[in-house]
């Protein structure tokens, strides 16, 4: 009787080990879930597919990053966007989304470095331009309020080369205010 139970348990274990689902089926299920905006299922299916295929599919890694971001798994999203960047899939948007995930993780230095790196690769990406400009405008205004004129000036100068009319105008205006205040302090 003990041998029969052992044989039964052994056969179930062997069946479960070798009964892995076809990776293409998992990917299809992930795509269907993603298209239905069922991001938790999409993330689970895509990450399982990527594990089985050793992270070889850059498009799936990108979409897995989006799904991870939607379910607030930001560290995992960064990892998947890194895979997409390394494999050169939708590079500009992958950098932009990676930066947003880093911002959600409150990793400001990495966030800014990712935006700078991404702007070198895709200088016309509107999302990165917007986030980079907004970051430095806010940092410049905070430095200005704290009385750190040189730091504020450096922040505003980083916004000027960007191709965003509103941010460029705000940065130039803020630089003008800094100069005016410096002049007023001298008198």
Model-inferred region functions:
Residues 35-36, 70, 104-105, 138, ...:
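Register position in tetratricopeptide repeats
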Residues 2, 17-63, 70-75:
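N-terminal leader/linker segments that initiate helical-solenoid repeat arrays
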Residues 62-63, 97, 131, 138, ...:
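Canonical tetratricopeptide repeat
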Residues 54-55, 89, 123, 164-166:
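Short coil turns that delineate tetratricopeptide repeat
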Residues 24, 58-59, 93, 127, ...:
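Start-of-helix register in tetratricopeptide repeats
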């Amino acid at each position: 009787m003990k041998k029969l139970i052992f044989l039964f348990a052994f056969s179930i274990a062997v069946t479960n080990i070798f009964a892995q689902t076809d990776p293409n089926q998992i990917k299809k299920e992930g795509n269907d879930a993603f298209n239905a905006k069922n991001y938790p299922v999409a993330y689970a299916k895509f990450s399982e597919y990527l594990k089985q295929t050793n992270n070889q599919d850059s498009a799936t890694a990108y979409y897995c990053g989006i799904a991870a971001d939607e379910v607030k798994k930001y560290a995992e999203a960064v990892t998947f966007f890194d895979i997409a960047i390394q494999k050169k899939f939708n590079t500009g948007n992958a950098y932009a989304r990676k930066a947003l995930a880093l911002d959600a993780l409150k990793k400001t230095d990495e966030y800014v470095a990712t935006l700078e790196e991404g702007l070198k690769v895709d200088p016309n990406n509107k999302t990165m331009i917007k986030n980079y400009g907004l970051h430095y405008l806010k940092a410049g205004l905070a430095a200005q309020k704290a009385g750190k004129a040189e730091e504020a000036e450096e922040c505003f100068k980083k916004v000027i080369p960007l191709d965003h009319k509103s941010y460029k105008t705000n940065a130039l205006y803020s630089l003008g205010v800094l100069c005016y205040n410096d002049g007023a302090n001298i008198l």
